[in-house]
């Protein structure tokens, strides 16, 4: 990449965190069990109040939360209490929803429901996973007819809700969440062609769609209103090729170069970088896994602040 301009090099972002980072503690989403044909939910040992306390202690500025973190309680009283609690903690909130999550239906919502919930908690952004299904083999299925039919319906549904999006003034982000190729996310955003609607780039999800990480970030950066900032170790052994989540800076994703791309190419609507870690589920007890998540979170926050220059507060 060419040398960054001084303006880009000096660009600041708030430091946020996706609640999925602590999913073993019952936050975010209990993901990954769909292959077993059943749903499973980790016991919640950290509720949203404790999560906000932890965020302040660790120097986070934004929490990227799901309906699981709201305990699926969308009563006006509860959502107003969440909004006020975030204000009291000095935290911004972003809402993460899916249309048809395969293993944890608690995170699912319609566009209409998500907009109302996001507005009620004072969210600055609502991120959508579209759960578009592609035929196999997947590597060459980008923009295939089966996917395009689903995407066209999604575009039309968002268009119907643009008056509400404008009324509430929340940013909207469409994610490459194991279900959309980079070009498909961009197609949806360009079809909607609205200043409040952009993309959410997860820095490792492209691997599942047989895409390169650098190429994905390069393409999506100009559209990014949201980033799930991940690092993974990628390796092969006799059991196959693996991509395992780890603390930021410990993996095979060049996170320094990714931040250079985002600082140079992302629009001003991208004001937050959300840490996300997906540690492996195997190799330790559940209790030890929860401790590992906290350790990886703290190591990542330190790296993102000290090495990547992310964060606008002194703590």
Put a short name on every predicted segment:
Residues 76-81, 108-113, 144-155, 211-219, ...:
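Charged helix-capping and loop-helix junction motifs
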Residues 118-147, 167-180:
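Active-site groove signature of glycoside hydrolases
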Residues 13-20, 63-65, 93-97, 126-128, ...:
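Hydrophobic faces of well-ordered beta-strands that scaffold small-molecule active sites
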């Amino acid at each position: 990449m060419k040398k960054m301009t001084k303006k880009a090099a000096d660009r600041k972002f708030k430091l946020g965190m996706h609640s999925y980072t602590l999913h073993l503690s019952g936050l975010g989403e209990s993901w990954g069990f769909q292959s077993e044909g059943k749903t499973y939910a980790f016991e919640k040992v950290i509720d949203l109040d404790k999560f906000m306390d932890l965020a302040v202690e660790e120097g986070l500025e934004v929490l990227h939360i799901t309906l699981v973190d709201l305990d699926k309680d969308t009563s006006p009283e509860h959502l107003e209490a969440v909004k006020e609690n975030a204000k009291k903690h000095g935290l911004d909130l972003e809402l993460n929803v899916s249309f048809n999550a395969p293993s944890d239906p608690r995170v699912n919502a319609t566009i209409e429901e998500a907009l109302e919930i996001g507005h009620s908690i004072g969210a600055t952004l609502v991120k959508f996973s579209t759960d578009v299904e592609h035929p196999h083999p997947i590597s060459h299925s980008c923009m295939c007819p089966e996917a395009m039919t689903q995407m066209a319906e999604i575009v039309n549904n968002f268009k119907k809700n643009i008056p509400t999006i404008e009324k509430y003034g929340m940013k909207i982000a469409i994610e490459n969440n194991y279900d959309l190729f980079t070009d498909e996310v961009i197609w949806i955003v360009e079809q909607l062609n609205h200043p409040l609607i952009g993309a959410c780039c997860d820095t490792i999800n492209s691997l599942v769609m047989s895409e390169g990480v650098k190429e994905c970030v390069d393409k999506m950066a100009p559209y990014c209103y949201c980033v799930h900032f991940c690092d993974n170790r990628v390796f092969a052994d006799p059991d196959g090729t693996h991509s395992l989540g780890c603390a930021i800076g410990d993996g095979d994703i060049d996170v320094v170069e990714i931040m250079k791309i985002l600082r140079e190419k992302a629009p001003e609507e991208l004001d937050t970088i959300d840490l996300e870690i997906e540690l492996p589920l195997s190799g330790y007890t559940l209790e030890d896994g929860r401790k590992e998540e906290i350790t990886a979170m703290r190591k990542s926050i330190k790296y993102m602040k000290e090495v990547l220059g992310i964060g606008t507060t002194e703590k």
